[in-house]
């Protein structure tokens, strides 16, 4: 949950925030914090693309949350491994070092400090704690597919499906009076296929 200012909300690491009905400790967008008043129930990331099937046909593909095929296999945004502490039940959040991964996969190429081990992967840079609270994770659409229309979005990894999309997601709150009623949700969408 992010709750450092007057908004409290639960963040899920599959592209959504708010109350996904998964339990009593999951919060909708509550304002002010601890008032029980909800203003937004749920927010989710939707991304659509036209993909070319192996047969040369163009088909639409939209990735959303809470979607599965008839066998129960996920077809939704899924967390990219490595962006949370595997020994924690929480998402990586700036004000709780126990939620951070041992190293950050997207920082492994840093020549001076590969993986930024023991450091926060902040929007404003390494160990930059500008926001009162900041959540960071990545999702991919690798499990989504078009039923009955095979295609290969990434020729370097044929196990991937979806549109080959990676999304870096951040939620940030500040306690400063001018923005104490605001949460910033940033979605950095990358075509990785």
Region spans (language model):
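A long-range scaffold signal marking pre-active-site subdomains of enzyme folds
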Residues: 1-193
